[in-house]
């Protein structure tokens, strides 16, 4: 009787273990920056699910930056563009402080997308907040998703509620209404 109970419990344990949700395993490579890689993996496993579609996981990451990160005005020295080192530094700082400018938000978005297995590139350009206004320097992300080039701009997707647009997997045509950039510079 005791042996039957043990076998039954063991079988039940195996069934439960097989049914347990599997953690999200990103397809991309880590950056090599241990602190950043640990924080990114933790965030992805918290926000994404192996059961979700690709679009649902991309939306979850975008929404995290758009809604859980506070905008802090400021500029980084972008004279040399977004080097890997600067991108990683901005992303890690943003994860720790939970506030940052468009450069930091774009850097984190790119790092997360790359870790998820997508080709992602930071874009520098300008943004016009309202018709007739002067353009301001701005940064966002271009990525290949399902073979299609799309854009992510979490800053104007959440932090500026009066101006909120859905720039998650946005086509170029949508961004061209307010964003300006050199499309020839994109890979």
List the model feature ranges, each with a label.
Residues 165-187:
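Low-complexity, Gly/Ser/Thr/Pro-rich intrinsically disordered linker/tail segments
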Residues 20-22:
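Bacterial signal peptide processing site
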Residues 30-96:
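Secondary-structure boundary elements
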Residues 1-4:
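Positively charged n-region of N-terminal signal peptides that target proteins for export
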Residues 11-12:
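Repetitive helical segments and hydrophobic/amphipathic motifs
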Residues 15-18:
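C-terminal motif of bacterial Sec signal peptides marking the signal peptidase cleavage site
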Residues 63, 104-173:
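Hydrophobic/aromatic-rich core segments of domains that either
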